[in-house]
A protein has these predicted regions:
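A short coil-to-beta-strand element that immediately follows conserved catalytic motifs
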Residues: 59-65
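C-terminal, non-catalytic "cap/extension" segments appended to globular domains
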Residues: 6-28, 43-50, 60, 70-79, ...
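NTP-dependent nucleotidyl-transfer catalytic core
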Residues: 1-4
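Short, solvent-exposed loop/turn segments at the edges of secondary structure
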Residues: 88-92, 137-140, 188
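A short glycine/serine-rich beta->alpha loop
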Residues: 100, 128-132, 238-245
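Post-HEXXH active-site segment of zinc metalloproteases
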Residues: 98, 107, 119-145, 158-160
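Short pre-active-site segment immediately N-terminal to the catalytic Zn-binding motif
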Residues: 34-39, 90-110
Length: 331
């Protein structure tokens, strides 16, 4: 954490100022724009909703605005970790987060609403089919929309006056890679550790050692001081004691770029993939909606094919997205 700014080394964004190339800054700060516009939590969520309605999704129900939590309450303690909820098997969808005027929260809103619009899309399916095609699809849907929060999109909605030139692309891509690509090893190892524990391959007296062995194998990181079996470091990750599967986040990192490439093509985007936004594209919205409405009623390869035309998950879209950054690193 003292080196990378994250206790699990799952996000390396905090080292960006140390590694980004000179002259490659984005040219704008979305956080500063949101603050200067005095854009409050409700308007930030309304902006996220308008992204989805621009794709021809129905607006969120009135109950969403009354029952969601957007601001940290002053009269009680709450868990501010952002989450999306579907509460009555009909149309009572909500989000729960303590929204600040930051670029991160602006993107998170677009992500969390992806869960809500997915939940509404499969609402008319039998109850057993009211879920995503596999665990990764739910996370990937919101992440896909977050990939469309580009400078081009910010210009269209009036938050930027002009699109920065291509010289800023390396810095923007580096920032996203430090969050997305750096996450992949950690996203893979959490459930690898859990499966080894459940199978008995790792015994209780080696829980912590097995955790750090995987951290070193996949992430190349080691503890700053000795961590014996008197510690239980995996338990510091919320998803372990909460019994929440973690592979879904690894899969989502692959799927979101595959979804984004397919939808960008449907939207007719001819720019480099990292500059494409599907905002306002009803054809892209129709393709996305067709997949979301399937819910869990079909095997996940069918849902993937409905959106991308392929039946296998494919990381080549991630490679395509970061191609300009890869070329810069090669130089």
């Amino acid at each position: 954490a003292h080196l990378l700014g994250n206790v699990w080394a799952r996000d390396w964004s905090h080292v960006r100022p140390l590694v980004e190339p000179r002259g490659s800054k984005a040219g704008y700060s979305l956080t500063e724009i949101l603050k200067s516009r005095k854009m409050g939590p409700i308007e930030m969520v309304r902006t996220g909703e308008r992204f989805y309605t621009s794709l021809d999704f129905d607006p969120l129900p009135e109950t969403f605005w009354r029952r969601s939590l957007f601001v940290r309450p002053r009269d009680r303690e709450v868990v501010c970790h952002a989450s999306a909820w579907d509460l009555d098997l009909r149309d009572d969808v909500r989000i729960k987060m303590c929204i600040d005027q930051t670029a991160e929260d602006f993107s998170t809103i677009h992500h969390e609403l992806g869960h809500n619009f997915y939940q509404r899309a499969y609402m008319n399916r039998p109850v057993l089919f009211r879920d995503s095609a596999n665990d990764g699809f739910h996370e990937a849907t919101g992440d896909t929309i977050s990939l469309s929060v580009t400078p081009e999109y910010l210009v269209k909605i009036g938050l930027l006056s002009h699109v920065p030139d291509a010289s800023s692309d390396t810095g923007l891509l580096l920032g996203r890679a430090l969050a997305n690509v750096a996450f992949l090893p950690f996203g893979l190892l959490v459930d690898q550790w859990r499966w080894k524990v459940f199978s008995g391959e790792v015994s209780p007296e080696n829980y912590n050692k097995a955790w750090w062995d995987l951290r070193l194998k996949y992430q190349g990181v080691a503890p700053a001081s000795p961590r014996g079996e008197e510690f239980f470091d995996p338990g510091a990750k919320y998803h372990v004691p909460a019994n929440t599967p973690y592979t879904r986040y690894f899969l989502a990192q692959i799927l979101q770029f595959q979804f984004h490439r397919a939808l960008a093509k449907t939207a007719g985007c001819t720019m480099p993939l990292h500059r494409c936004s599907i905002y306002g594209s009803k054809p892209a919205g129709a393709r996305l909606k067709a997949m979301l409405e399937m819910g869990l009623s079909r095997p996940w390869p069918d849902a993937l094919e409905a959106l991308t035309g392929a039946r296998e998950m494919d990381a080549s879209a991630l490679v395509d997205y970061f191609a300009p950054l890869s070329a810069w690193l090669d130089e």
